[in-house]
């Protein structure tokens, strides 16, 4: 064991001598070092604007959703048949444990031509592919089902913010005077243009349709008046027989059940059955509805949505592989500016809305963190120069964090931004060790250059040890797998990359900054230092520095 410690100390001493040699060389070219530091500030600013932004990483939650949308007007049996075909394809995957299909249901309403399949996956450690990769492999297989649109999607990262991952774009009729045909035309142009964008995953789609087969029932009010039939009675009859109506409750085995009345299925399966219903007139005569109503086949929208009081159509999509949600949002906004007429507008909903509203807060929070640390350090050192020197090491950490995110293909999301705030303290810690010790030596009368070099040399070992412990502690987050891996990888990569780069560069940059800024302080503030005693060949001499 002693041999191991001896080798370790020998390595440390070699590193220390090499570091001292390098630092002495850099002191001679301070102007070049400062120039490179300013260049790194520019690179950091460029990285901050060029690294793709997003709100939250797309997580593997152990399941995914498959949306099934058949042609308008088809029966539930038709939809169920298509869903069984989709389930057969899904169950062929070795990563799948089971499926749960719900026909006649969609996240925008209950209709016979819609269905949803929930697919559960094996535990993360038992499969080699993530949910996103499985969804990508299923895209081509499920698109081969031509009887309906079958689309696998990831669930939303935060439950309640949207029905599935990606963005929700609300196309709005701002003027309020456009009919459905006009809205459909504008929507078609928007979708056609959006599906040509390289930043958007194909398809960008909507579940809205305005061609659902319907029956228009027109009541002949004059005829009803002549037969002394109340028009409200006609509407109530249609509601009771064709829809349903709540009557009362009853108790059975200590549970309460609701009672609804409705015509049996065989008596409301054809449009002609409407004419066979009867209403009572004021003279107690039973009048068939065939004498009072006119039936006209037509088409229309199953549901008409409104968003913030405007009639709207929801459009769904997601970022293309290798692109961020911020780039996808920007691409949709560019398409909307090119395509939408002046009477139409748009808004974001779901997680895209959260990303838009919170996107501008990250620089503010980071800036407040810098101000808070600066004020604390200013109170500790009783000046503003030392805190400035210390905080100038933070951009080095930001540069390392954003470089690591970019190299790994990760986005500047909320977890990366949390990591940047953490790096304010982690990067400042290394600079504090150098500045604190250099101040002590300088106040004893040692020249500022010699004080900075000696302080950096003396503090090398604690800086490396604390940085190494931090890097070893954060590294498992950077390579995390399983549940929540996306958020952990984003946070771990940002902190690991920032700490690694900041530790290495600050060892050379901070002493130079201390020398340059400290010299300017001493020159312009006329700061005097006490005499410094130097022992040389057994003789003690006193040097006075001004």
Which residue ranges define each predicted feature?
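Alpha-helical membrane-interface segments at transmembrane helix boundaries
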Residues: 12-30, 52, 56, 87, ...
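Hydrophobic transmembrane alpha-helices and their membrane-interface caps
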Residues: 372-459, 464-483, 497, 501, ...
